[in-house]
Amino acid sequence: MENIAHHNTTYNITPICSDSSECSSMEMLPLGCKTHSDKSDARRNLMDTGIYTPDSNSDSSDPRSDSSCVDVSNSLAVSHPISFCNWTDEESSLLTEHIKTDLTSEALTSAFPNKSLALIIRKIHDLQPVLDWTKNEIYLLAGIILNDSNSAIRRHKHKFPCRNVSNLNKKFQHYKNMVRRLNGVDHSKWTKPEIASLISLIDYDLTKTKLQKELPNKNIEEIKDLTNEMRIHSNFSHVESVLFEQTMTENDPIEIVLDQFPLKNKETCKKRLLKLNELSQHRDMAKRRLDEFESLIQNELKQIKDSIDLTRLKYLLVNDLTGKQLRSSFPGISMKYLKLIAKEMGFDEAGEYTLAEMNFLKKALQENAKLKSIIDELPFRSQLSIETKINSVEPNRRRSVFTSQVDELLYMAKWYSSDNFGNLSRRRNSRYASKLDKPKDKASDIMQPSKLHLENEEVTEAKVIPHDKGVENMISDHKLKGKNNEQKKRKSKKPTSMVEVLKEESAYFQSVTGNRCVLKEGQKRKRERLMQIKLETKLKKPKSQNLNETNRIQETKKLMKCDVEPDKVKEQKSFKSENLKEAKLDASDSSIVSDVEISLKKKLNKIENEEKRSPYDPEDISTDTLVPLYGRQLYVNEVYETQPRPPKLSFREDTNIMVQNCSEISLTDTIAADIISQHCKNYRDMPISFPSLTIVDRNTNRMILNPMNKIRIRFLLYPQHSELFILAEPKSNELDPINEIKKLFQLHYSLFFSHSSKLKKIILSEYNKEIDISIEENDFVRFMFVIDKWNRLMVELTPNDVDIGSHDINEEIRAYLSPNEIKIPSDEDIRLDIFYSEIQLSTEENPISDNDPIEPSSPSFDLIKSMKRCFTHDSSNRLTPPISSEEDNKENEPPIESDFRNNNNKGSIPCTPVRLNTRNKMVVNAVKPENYESNFFRHLKEKTSVSRFCVQQILLRIYSRIVSTESRKLRSYKAFTAEVYGELLPSFTSEVLTKVNLQPQHKFYDLGSGVGNTTFQAALEFGVHLSGGCEIMEHASKLTELQTMLLNKHLALLGLKKLPLNFALSQSFVENDIVRQAVIECDVLLVNNYLFDVNLNTAVGKMLYGLKPGTKIISLRNFIRPRYKASSDKTIFDYLKVERHEMSNYLSVSWTANKVPYYISTVQENICEEYV
């Protein structure tokens, strides 16, 4: 083994002072200095002349500090006397070069033989106070470690004169740990000088050119292998950063540029490019290089995808995703690329773990493995996913384990008593003990106090002890010992045991409960009947959401009036049987009635004075408010043509394209059903007559999702499209399929039938209310009839001439109905004649009134009745397959098992399919008028307002399908910073944008748009000319893109116009010219500055400088601080006139339930006078 460490240099110490006793401290003093004051003065004079410099080991930065005087026998002693000379320019430049390359003692003394080491160190600190480690210093340190890793670094301190002990020890331990990782690794091809050279280049230069120059006998692959074993970091040094910027500026291909940095992975290079992208002078270059970088990664990903066995990867995604199996199956392939390929194949890192992963995780937890090793062995899982799975596998991992029930009881008693009475309180002393446990390796670094040097006279005087004082001390010690003996004789109190504590607490519990008597030994507790308190008022039944405020108050009044009837009061007071005659009310009864009436009047006044719901937060279409259109077109352009028609859409049987950036739409939208299936633990079964959420798989005997529990709802404009739901009841605030179905009914009314109050009543009473009643009464047959009515109504009323076939879209779930329970909705059931007549009428002929009865009015056309056969194979029935009615003969019906509807069968799929009779039935149906389509589109053209409830529900439908399931990730940001995610609810956006009078000709922008809710709402509800937003968070930006794609497809299905959106995602608005240009042109600006700090507020003010007068800025905090005065800085704050407002609704933001204040700042033409 070669020895590459510098040999110890022997220095001759020439004492200047003639007195050997005074030179024992190894201080260099002029001749004749003998006293301590003379030494101090002489040291100070030498420091003033620049000859004496304290040892660099001292932590003091002041060279004149007396406290920095330490033993300099090794560092300041030289083989020649101290010379009084100045530094020439050549020597200074040479020393500057040494500061960059080599600061070892051997290099400094050889370069400046006529200078003392103390003078050299002082000059170095004058030239550069903060010193970086040089390459040769690290080379020397690495050589010391490689030769003798157990050597103490203090023995080699003299070789590093510019480093103090703590800094040197820290560096020594860092490289020692790095070299220690080579133990057990075959590195016989490497010599010690080569390893030391590689270590010296870590923080200096690891480019390809430098590596080939320093290590000519090694290729790049060998160097990569050794650096991987040593776990050398891949951060850019200063030299590498400069070279990276230069090479990126050139026109060389990206592959050649990356080849110059062989030890830097692509992620590190990409992060460096992103930092360059933040600089305005490099933005164009960085953007171009980032595009090249992405294409390079995609090409590599494609090559890897073509080279590996995808079938094998699919198998491993289901069975084994441990790192060991993946590395053996795909040797040499990066786990990052494998994970990207797996995600393209539908892999979800938060999904179910494979059996091999679970076995490994359990084994690792049993062996108490570290979390880092578990993460390394599960490369396809994130740290958050692994921690969540660990908590679910071993939820009681940190709980105390008791050997018996008595130990557990005593443990509980101990903590219970300490919390309530303080008898056995114990405080954890580890934090105090940790201060006393000093590491052994640092004990040698503690500086020993210097010995006190006293004169002979001072020593003699110190030895003399006053006799009187000694006698007094002896007397006091004797008294103290006597008191200690008395205290020792006293008997200590008997400590309270845990059992006694339990008895005391049990006695206290008995004294406050039951008959409040403490039980004695052998006594039993008396049983007393529990006191029952009867409520004075009746509990109100839950009302369906389709009742408006007026109807609810009227129903409450009726119920309360019934409660004060004399018969009911008499019935409550009477204790006789029902056969006795009714008695007249006496004076006492009448007084009771009057008291009840008074209490009821108070309740009525309270209900009438109850705060009304905010008009900006409608609950349903009965409490809806309207937003004026101001002449803008709400629907697609085809609606406003001379011959209106729904635009043609391309449908495809692919459930994934709903969240893809393409023009095609899935024939069946399964997003809502997928959410329920992926989070089925958050749902429970519907009432017993409804299909169960899960069933038992007969093959595996495990619970699986019920494949028959599927319900589909058609759309009006495109009845061939349907939305799929799984019937289940959410346990908390998850997506509710029943509410989604009811809201979809109301959406169709608001968009296509809002001109008719009769149709509103039909939607509310015969669809929404019927669904509520069917669930409350546990009637699945009634529920399915409502769904069938709606699907057939959509088919009959659609203005789109499409062939949707004759198949039953709800065939699976209809298997839970017997043939006698299947009811075919007729024209009368779906009120088809009323719909036709209401659509034929004009707005003047059909004024909206909530009091209109649901009866067919006198139509403006002759309603044609015809006898026709329906539900035959060749008919146009598009709801169900041929089904027999109850009046048909039942001879051909198959036998039905009597216990099919039994509770025991709930959760199982019917084994025998139901055979249906194909006999036809003669019914009377209404025929669609010839001018139906023109009148239908006429109502859409004549719309002058849009439903606020409709707009908000469209946005909430998108939000619940995209954002709600990812809300936890949105909150994984540092608290109380500008990146904290907080949502402005739709009611807030509606109110504030109405307050600023936002109109279609305006432009809107949201600085900090989050997932894009306010930007979407400004475009959809107010129809602005352009709606934009900027967001810096990666996950929120991704959700914005997904919401945009899904929203555009939902708008197309509803016939609404595409929104004009302009987002700047995954980027900051600070020093962003593109965002600033878009903001300057807008008319209304929203800034959620609730958690902006002073610096960010100042940056926003400078960014907004140049807004045109009249622009409105909405913020949650006032931009203008108290006593603000205008300055020379170019900021918009000097031109703002601020008004404070308060929300009318309590629930308007996500972080509080209180009414939130907000500020509207208007830009003025000149600087406001109050700021001058």
Swiss-Prot record:
It is an enzyme of class 2 (transferase). InterPro entries: DOT1_dom, H3-K79_meTrfase, SAM-dependent_MTases_sf. Keywords: Chromatin regulator, Methyltransferase, Nucleus, Repeat, S-adenosyl-L-methionine, Transcription, Transcription regulation, Transferase. Pfam families: DOT1 (PF08123). Residues 473-487 have a biased composition (Basic and acidic residues). Its EC number is 2.1.1.360. Residues 846-1172 form the DOT1 domain. It comes from the Eukaryota. Coiled coil: none annotated. It catalyses: L-lysyl(79)-[histone H3] + 3 S-adenosyl-L-methionine = N(6),N(6),N(6)-trimethyl-L-lysyl(79)-[histone H3] + 3 S-adenosyl-L-homocysteine + 3 H(+). One of its GO terms (cellular component) is nucleus. It is found in: Nucleus. Belongs to the class I-like SAM-binding methyltransferase superfamily. DOT1 family. This is Histone-lysine N-methyltransferase, H3 lysine-79 specific. The gene is DOT1.
